């Protein structure tokens, strides 16, 4: 095999709680991660030149060692002394710096692709151990589906699949620094923690109303006061018929869950007309796990 094309799927957080701040500055979390059917496309092939070549449809995206795809390729090249080079055509559809693990899922796809291209024989768990060296979300992006993430996000427990439903994605034209969000999170003053255990119970019992009732993201306590448009997008989604709406990760992307496709399509049109978000997509929950 000399070439492979893969979809790198985005994630949302159905629940995100921060447990504590560690002495090393990292925060320990409890999150429910969920894959959705919004994806980047990676067309990967071996080349004779001993280098990593990346081209992208986004001119502002780094295509050097600052790109997680590059880091993933370099990691396996060095570990297995691979002499071939790699060429990657990366077509981005997942919003960048949006709280949807766009860079991490691309890196996960790269690890998976190189394992196939070079017949390295690494299991999914072995790939996940290497993935955490690139980023905390990479192991989950290798796993996919519905999962509880703990620690800094790298300790994963697979959960039963989430009920499939339409998902509306809206990213406003603002940038939110993950570091800023976590640095300004006042855990000692935080009283509104999402009930992650209740959320897991709802998922296991296929209780869609329960999932919607127990969704929550503790990081909204920082982002919404600083970026009111996030709250405005949530309100717009709820007015348009969403059963629940929440910010994903550290933002600024907001998503809404819907019971039926027609309501979701109408909400898509209304969100576009509102002008609140620069990027708007209608997709669905995706439950196929990577083997």
Where in the sequence are the language-model features?
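ATP-binding N-lobe of GHMP and related small-molecule kinases
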Residues: 1-98, 116, 120-128, 134, ...
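ATP-dependent small-molecule kinase catalytic core of the GHMP/sugar-kinase superfamily
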Residues: 2-7, 15-17, 21-31, 120-244, ...
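Residues embedded in well-ordered beta-strands within globular domains across many folds
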Residues: 43, 87-89, 246, 281-284
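Short, basic/glycine-rich phosphate-binding loops at helix/coil junctions
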Residues: 48-62, 110, 205-215
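A generic structural signal for short
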Residues: 61, 99, 221-222, 256
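Glycine/serine-rich anion-binding loops at beta->alpha junctions
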Residues: 89-118, 136, 243-258
